[in-house]
Amino acid sequence: MSKVKGDLEKSDKRPPSSMSTGSADSGVFSSGVHASSPSHSQGSSSQSGPPSPTTQLNSLLFETANLIAVNEQLRKEIAENKQIQTNQMRALRYSSNPVDQPFVANSISPHHGFPQRPPRGERRMQKPESYKTVICQAWLESKTCTFAENCRFAHGEEELRPAKLESRQNNKYKTKLCDKYTTTGLCPYGKRCLFIHPDNQPNAYIRADKLYEVSQRHALADLRDHVESQIMTGNTRNSYNQQPPPMGGLEMQSSPMKSSSDSSHMRSPMAQMNCETTRPHPSWPLESSSFFLPPEMSSINNNNLMSPFETPFPNGSTGIQPHFVTAKRRAAFPPVPSNFQQDDDNMSSIPGFDHLAEDMAKHLELW
């Protein structure tokens, strides 16, 4: 019973509900303390019914501010598009009438409003300050450059231009070894390099141990150019020095029946004199090869040379002889080797071979 009485007393001491009619903070007539707390009012409004007019007004103001910002951004984009369109129309108008084109229109392209590139000729005419102030790396290595005359680097010290930029005068000047000179043995800057070239007494561009190798490549390049020029000039001279063929267009040098030894013999001066003294008969393709030799040589060859069908055996057996047997039999006669020796001497007397040999000896020397 005592427990039941205690529970009743606790229930009587509970604070009155806000929904009761007699309480001071009930319903619409709430106290100022409860009205001043926004969290309590918002929580009660969200739980009880629709949001308050203040919340609705705040949300409307926020949406309006967002719309104003979007509208301002769109206005800026429209103004920029109008400016671009105006520039394009102006460029199109000036391209149709270039006389009235102002200076500003030169920097605007008629398409997409991009600046125009200068013509190729004008761009090539504008040479930078570093033009021909450094030796070409490819030319320095092997004296060959794919750009040739159009290379922007110098091909030799005679093409070097004075550098307008002074060498850097700072505390680190000439305090570090040049990587190109020390690793590869070549540096295209030479004396103008900002780094140290150790032991560069013979050549400032090439290391001493690489000098011989590079000089050989340069000499071979010079020799190749010299031979090419000689070939070109020789072909032009031969085209003017050709003589008409004798005996109705028959020329002995164009004969397909002539051997290699005959061709080398015909190039010698003595053979040319013999050919002039012994002109071929109109039926010379049917004659033997001894017809074109001097009388004494023809008699020796007729006595010594044998047919490939003859036999060297004393018993007189006939048959086809092997090639090495006939070659050995021919080599046993002394006049034939003397004839070949004479051809070799005549080949050595041709003008031009000694000249080329002297040029090769000169170019293969060191610089």
From Swiss-Prot:
Residue ranges, annotated region (Disordered): 1-57, 107-126, 235-268
Any one of the GO CC terms: P granule
Keyword Zinc on entry: yes
Coiled coil start-end: 63-92
InterPro entries: ZFP36-like, Znf_CCCH, Znf_CCCH_sf
Positions of C3H1-type zinc fingers: 130-158, 172-200
Biased composition (Basic and acidic residues): 1-15
GO molecular function: mRNA 3'-UTR binding; zinc ion binding
Pfam families: zf-CCCH
Tissues/organs with expression: Exclusively expressed in the hermaphrodite gonad. Weakly distributed throughout gonadal oocytes from the mitotic stage to the developing diakinesis stage, with expression restricted to the distal region of the gonad.
Phenotype upon gene inactivation: In adult hermaphrodites, double RNAi-mediated knockdown with oma-1 results in a 20% reduction in number of eggs laid. Triple RNAi-mediated knockdown with oma-1 and oma-2 results in a 85% reduction in number of eggs laid.
Function: Zinc-finger protein that may play a role in oocyte maturation and fertility.
Listed name of the protein: CCCH-type zinc finger protein moe-3
Gene that this sequence comes from: moe-3
